[in-house]
A protein has these predicted regions:
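Conserved small/polar residues in nucleotide/adenosyl-binding loops
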Residues: 198-201
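Conserved beta-strand element within WD40/beta-propeller blades
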Residues: 55, 106-107, 155-156
Length: 201
């Protein structure tokens, strides 16, 4: 069973990348991205949109299942690498990427966030969260991903903070303390947006 669901996720993400529409070119030759707000309606529909993977588990039930059928048992052997991105950060890569409006958002160990063109892998922006020198990490420096909602990207950090970034630029919108890292608190989880309560958990 474990192998089956992993293949399902892999096939779904590859199908998702293949299904992404081409973006228009701006006058300066750069791609233009039509960043629509990630509304509660979009989040509730989960994987209904074949061009998006809007949260860690795909939907609020965290099924991690994609209904796309482009990749199957017969043609999976024909897949080839479309692009590759290396973070350059030591440690494990345990994050599940999220995709919205042609942009893939990914985290690496030590709280680095990347926005990549989902079609080409081209880096669009990067955020490096400053960690304190006296940080005590109990169980490794991994981060398991981001949440997106409206025009923001959310990440929980090793020093027990919740950071909101602008989806378009990667600039910090706000940065708030969850608890005191000096008391041993930390967070590696991918946040979840609970819109009816207007909160990020």
């Amino acid at each position: 069973m474990q192998c089956t669901w992993r293949w399902g996720i892999a096939a779904g993400l590859v199908s998702l990348l293949l299904a992404l529409p081409l973006k228009a070119q701006a006058q300066d030759g750069k791609k233009e991205y039509n960043l629509k707000p990630v509304t509660q309606e979009r989040l509730l529909k989960g994987t209904d949109d074949p061009s998006a993977w809007l949260m860690y588990g795909g939907n609020y039930q965290s099924w991690r299942f994609s209904p796309l059928k482009d990749v199957n048992r017969q043609n999976v052997k024909n897949l080839r690498v479309a692009w590759m991105f290396q973070t350059g950060i030591p440690g494990q890569l345990e994050a599940s990427p999220v995709i919205a409006d042609g942009i893939l958002y990914l985290t690496a160990s030590y709280n680095h966030v990347y926005a990549l063109d989902a079609e080409t892998g081209e880096p669009l922006w990067k955020y490096d969260h400053p960690l304190p020198d006296d940080l005590r990490i109990c169980c490794g420096p991994t981060n398991r991903g981001v949440a997106i909602a409206d025009d923001k990207v959310f990440m929980a950090t090793l020093d027990a903070r919740l950071v909101a970034l602008d989806r378009k630029t990667g600039q910090v919108v706000w940065n708030t303390e969850i608890d005191k890292y000096t008391n041993g608190y930390s967070s590696t989880v991918a946040p979840l947006v609970v819109r009816d309560r207007k909160s990020v958990v």
